[in-house]
Amino acid sequence: PKDTTSVPLPVPDYLAGLTGDLRGVAIGVDRRWTSEGTDEAAGKVLSEGLRVAADLGAKIKEITFPDPKAVIEDWFPLCGIEVAVAHEATYPARKDEYGPALAGLLDLGRAQSGMDYQKIVLRREAFRGAVRLLFETVDLIAVPAQAFAAPTLAKMAALGEDPSLITGLLRFTCPFDMTGSPTVTLPGGFAPNGGPVAFQFVGRHFDEASLVRAGDAFQRVTDWHKRHPAI
């Protein structure tokens, strides 16, 4: 009650819903979207995750996910605006203490106009509504965690220079940051280079219970969450 930004809904008993199976759960997957720009390891882990879910009783449904291109592009300036507000007391007054990546994001946010911001908000709300409608036909949506295995430090060094790197990292996370959808990320295997690979289940707003149930059921019959990459 002291936090006016919170939602006054009761917290469910998540443990009570851990049935160990997924009977009666409809899981949607857009195979075109989840395969475009996704490497073989990430695609294989998603497919295997869906196979396990089906074995646990889930119904796998083919869906068409709303085109996320605009909201992915909007995520960067919107993030910049939010970060600029958070750092207003120290940026740009202490700009020389900031690294180039964060400074660049702050500059991007500060460069947006009120008109720019409102257009982003409208596009975000339209996309959020389209995803909400999709959840009238399925209980969960399955997507990769990112388009490739966990990147090495050497690969991450090119973060500001290789556009495909940031795109691959954010392709399957930005859309659900923009909709505010809850997700659970589950380890599902390893790439040939030893990097861990994961996939996600995405749920309806305030239906974290379904995500906890799905994650628990998956991890009861797999042991990827107990394995570690060779270091």
Could you say what each language-model-derived stretch is?
Residues E40-T64, H87-A93, Y117, V121-V138, ...:
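Acyltransferase
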Residues T5-L9, E73, A89, K119, ...:
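Short, surface-exposed loop/helix-turn segments at secondary-structure junctions
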